[in-house]
Amino acid sequence: MSEFIAENRGADAITRPNWSAVFSVAFCVACLIIVEFLPVSLLTPMAQDLGISEGVAGQSVTVTAFVAMFASLFITQTIQATDRRYVVILFAVLLTLSCLLVSFANSFSLLLIGRACLGLALGGFWAMSASLTMRLVPPRTVPKALSVIFGAVSIALVIAAPLGSFLGELIGWRNVFNAAAVMGVLCIFWIIKSLPSLPGEPSHQKQNTFRLLQRPGVMAGMIAIFMSFAGQFAFFTYIRPVYMNLAGFGVDGLTLVLLSFGIASFIGTSLSSFILKRSVKLALAGAPLILAVSALVLTLWGSDKIVATGVAIIWGLTFALVPVGWSTWITRSLADQAEKAGSIQVAVIQLANTCGAAIGGYALDNIGLTSPLMLSGTLMLLTALLVTAKVKMKKS
C-alpha cells in the first residue's frame, strides 16, 4: 500500500493540505473511540436494564474488540480496489447503526449485534486511518495531520468515560447511545462533503503481511503489545464495579475519577514524546512495571478513596506511554513496512482487548471483586519482563 500511496502522490501532485477532510477523519476517529468506551461507564445500568450480570454486560466491549481484530486484518484486503471515500462513508454508517441497535436493544443478543457493527467500523477504519491521512496532505504536512488524528483520540479518551457516566445518570444509558447516533450522522455528512475520491489499491500490490512476524524481535514485541493491552482492558472495562464496590464511590465520585483518569491520559500522551526521546525500550518496560505496582496497591489498599483516586491518575498517566511507545517502536524497527506492521498491531490490540475484557469479566463474576486487578497486574509484570529480555529496538 505504501508503494501505491507513493505512486498516487506523484500522479495527483498534492500541493495543499485538505484540512477539512483531515478533521472529518479525526472527528470520525473520536466518535468511534467514544462509542467504543461508553459501556465502561454505563455497565451497571445496562446490566440492570437487560437483566444480566456486569461481567456479561462487559462482553459488549469484548465483541467489539473481537470483530475489530478481524476487520483490521482483512477489510483492507477485501476492499482493496474500492474507492476509500465510499468505504469511510460505510464505516460512518455502521457507527450510526451500531448506536441505534444498542439504544433499542431489548436483549443481550441485539446488544452484541450492535456492538459487532461498531467493531467492523472500528477495526477497518483504524487499519486505514494512517494511509488515508497521508493521501490528504503534502508529505511535509503528514506529521501535523497525524497529530490532529491522535489529538482527537486523546480528547475522546478524556471525555468518553466521564461523559457517559454523567449523561447516563441524567438521560439514561439508551439516550446516551441515541446522542452518539447523532454524532454518527454528523460524521456521514462531513465525510460526504469533505473527503475526496481516494482510489483503492490495485490487486497486484497485495503482499503477505504476516511475513513480518519472522523478523527478529517482532513476535516478542507483538506478544508484549498483547499482554499490555489485555492487562489494560482486564482492569479498565470493570473500573465502575471495582471502584463503586471496593472504594465506595457513588456515580458523581466515579465520574470525577474517570475524568481524572482521562485528563491524566491526555497529559501522559502530551509528555510521551519527551520520555520516548530518552529511551523507547525503557518506557516500554518501565510503564507496565509501574502499572503492575499500581494494581497491587489498589488490590491491597483500594478501599481508601484517596489511594483509589491516586491509582487511577497514575494509571492514566502511565498507560498513555504504551500505545505511543509501541507505535514509535514500529516506525523505528519496521520502518520499511510500517503500514503492514500497523495492521498487525491493530489486530493484536483488538485481540488483547477481547481476551482482557472476557477473562476479566469471568474473574469478576466467579473469583472476586479484585481479581481483574490481580490479572491486570500479572500481565503488566510479564510485559515488563518480556520487553527487557526479548524486544529489540533500532536506534533512530
Curated annotation (Swiss-Prot):
Segments on the Cytoplasmic side according to the record's topology features: 1-21, 76-85, 129-147, 197-215, 277-281, 327-343, 388-396
Stated consequence of mutating I267V: In strain: BEN2908 / O2:K1:H5 / APEC
Main location class: membrane
Means of activity regulation: Reducing the electrochemical proton gradient across the plasma membrane by the addition of the protonophore carbonyl cyanide m-chlorophenylhydrazone (CCCP) leads to a drastic reduction in the rate of inosine excretion.
Catalysed reactions listed for this entry: inosine(in) + H(+)(out) = inosine(out) + H(+)(in); guanosine(in) + H(+)(out) = guanosine(out) + H(+)(in)
UniProt note: phenotype after gene disruption: Inactivation of the gene leads to increased susceptibility to purine ribonucleosides.
Role played: Involved in the efflux of purine ribonucleosides, such as inosine and guanosine. Adenosine may also be a substrate. Confers resistance to the hypoxanthine analog 6-mercaptopurine, however the level of resistance is rather low.
Family: Belongs to the major facilitator superfamily. DHA1 family. NepI (TC 2.A.1.2.26) subfamily.
Protein name, UniProt field: Purine ribonucleoside efflux pump NepI
Species lineage: Bacteria, Pseudomonadati, Pseudomonadota, Gammaproteobacteria, Enterobacterales
